[in-house]
């Protein structure tokens, strides 16, 4: 009996030792981690970013790098499933939805906007196309609605009385009311409200099952808090057409799926055609060519050119448009996005099969995002 107990305890000890030895083994380090850490760690420190999710695509494989916390109060860490507000990166999904409406025959980009909204008949939008709304070239619609436009009735009245400052198509004026109206009317052309159409048709078609316009109760635990300049926890306050212009909440894993769809395609033929349509250039401003949602550059692209295309001058001022540049076979697509508490950046190069998603729960300068992403992509391109 004593011998049997000794054998039993010996076996248990052996198993325990094996378990401890296994637990002590270091998990394999992603070979891309030093590359990503070198750019991201200084960023977190300099801009006091509480948490960041970085997702990288290389050779068809996803790599995830997570830093800090999603919620300072609970201490919940960031993961590739953490939901972040992506601000204007939402415009790329809105543009894809609009392109899907085109592919389905519900509308055309050269349709006059008032064709899809009887309440716009007799206004300036009898002469402004859906494509001009989608590409911020309607003639000078502002970055934001005036503060007093806080209801659907006031929004309609605002559009009806608005008059272009420039000839439609002649100037780019980056604008939430412009692409917001495009998304709203595109959904109307498909006979559905925008949010259900996005959540029930487009996002599932892209494999983005953890992405929302309105975060449901069961996903709220994954929703990060953003942090203001004063370090107060905040989330987006929706305004008019916020869903269409800056309303998406998603994870780095889901947003990288969208990048992968833009690089390698999707099975749904109509959706694939829609994605391709968003990549087509409509005009150029400097080195940047404006597509539907996406902004593109001939690749390789210098850091300076990327910074210029995402500068305050391009975002806040009206810029004359020129014929779209010939980009050749290699193109980098990108988009920045922010809300008061979050900062996002997405960039990818289809010909190289590389892409990056950077989601942070602080709104920090575009310049810092672009410098970090440019450095990482340069290493990925090898």
UniProtKB/Swiss-Prot annotation:
The lineage of its organism: Bacteria, Pseudomonadati, Pseudomonadota, Gammaproteobacteria, Enterobacterales. Inhibited by the beta-lactamase-blocking agent sulbactam. Described as a cephamycinase, but cephamycin substrates such as cefoxitin are chemically very similar to cephalosporins, and sometimes classified as a type of cephalosporin. Cefoxitin is a poor substrate, hydrolyzed only weakly in vitro. Nevertheless, CMY-1 may confer resistance to poorer substrates by high level expression. Keywords: Antibiotic resistance, Hydrolase, Plasmid, Signal. The active site is at 88 (acyl-ester intermediate). The keyword Cell membrane does not apply. This is Beta-lactamase CMY-1. One of its GO terms (cellular component) is outer membrane-bounded periplasmic space. GO terms for biological process: antibiotic catabolic process; response to antibiotic. Residues 1-23 form the signal peptide. One of its GO terms (molecular function) is beta-lactamase activity. It catalyses: a beta-lactam + H2O = a substituted beta-amino acid. The keyword Aminoacyl-tRNA synthetase does not apply. A beta-lactam binds at residues 88, 144, 174, 176, 363. Belongs to the class-C beta-lactamase family. InterPro entries: Bact_CellWall_Synth/Modif (IPR050491), Beta-lactam-related (IPR001466), Beta-lactam/transpept-like (IPR012338), Beta-lactam_class-C_AS (IPR001586). Class C beta-lactamase which confers resistance to penicillins and cephalosporins. Has benzylpenicillin- and cefalotin-hydrolyzing activities. Has weak cefuroxime, cefotaxime, cefoxitin, imipenem and oxacillin-hydrolyzing activities. Its EC number is 3.5.2.6. Induction: May confer resistance to poorer substrates by high level expression. NCBIfam families: bla_class_C (NF033085), FOX-MOX (NF012172), MOX_CMY1_fam (NF000239). The gene is blaCMY-1. PANTHER family: BETA-LACTAMASE-RELATED, D-ALANYL-D-ALANINE-CARBOXYPEPTIDASE/ENDOPEPTIDASE AMPH.
């Amino acid at each position: 009996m004593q011998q049997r107990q000794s054998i039993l305890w010996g076996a248990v000890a052996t198993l325990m030792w094996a378990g401890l030895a296994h637990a002590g083994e270091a998990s394999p380090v992603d070979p891309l981690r030093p590359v990503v850490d070198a750019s991201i760690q200084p960023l977190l420190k300099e801009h006091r970013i509480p948490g960041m999710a970085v997702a990288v695509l290389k050779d068809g494989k996803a790599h995830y790098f997570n830093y800090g916390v999603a919620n300072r109060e609970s201490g919940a860490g960031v993961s590739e499933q953490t939901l972040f507000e992506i601000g204007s990166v939402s415009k790329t999904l809105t543009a894809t939805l609009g392109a899907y409406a085109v592919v389905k025959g519900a509308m055309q980009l050269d349709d006059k906007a008032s064709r899809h909204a009887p309440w716009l008949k007799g206004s300036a939008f009898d002469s402004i196309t859906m494509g001009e709304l989608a590409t911020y070239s309607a003639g000078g619609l502002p970055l934001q609605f005036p503060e007093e436009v806080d209801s659907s009735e006031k929004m309609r009245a605002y559009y009806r009385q608005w008059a272009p400052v420039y000839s439609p198509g002649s100037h780019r004026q980056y604008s939430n009311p412009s692409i917001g109206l495009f998304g709203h009317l595109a959904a109307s052309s498909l006979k559905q409200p925008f949010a259900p159409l996005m959540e029930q048709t487009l996002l599932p078609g892209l494999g983005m099952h953890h992405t929302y316009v309105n975060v449901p109760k069961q996903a709220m635990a994954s929703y990060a808090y953003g942090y203001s300049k004063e370090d107060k926890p905040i989330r987006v306050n929706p305004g008019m057409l916020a869903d269409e212009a800056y309303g998406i909440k998603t994870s780095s894993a889901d947003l990288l799926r969208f990048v992968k769809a833009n690089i390698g395609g999707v099975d749904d033929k109509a959706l694939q055609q829609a994605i391709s349509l968003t990549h087509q250039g409509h005009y150029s401003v400097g080195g940047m060519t404006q597509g539907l949602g996406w902004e593109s550059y001939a690749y390789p692209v210098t850091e300076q050119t990327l910074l210029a295309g995402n500068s305050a001058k391009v975002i806040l001022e009206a810029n004359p448009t020129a014929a779209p540049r010939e980009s050749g076979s290699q193109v980098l697509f990108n988009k920045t996005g922010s809300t008061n508490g979050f900062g996002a950046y997405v960039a990818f190069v289809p010909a190289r099969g590389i892409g990056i998603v950077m989601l942070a729960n602080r709104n920090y300068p575009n310049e810092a995002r672009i410098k970090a992403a440019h450095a990482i992509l340069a290493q990925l391109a090898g």
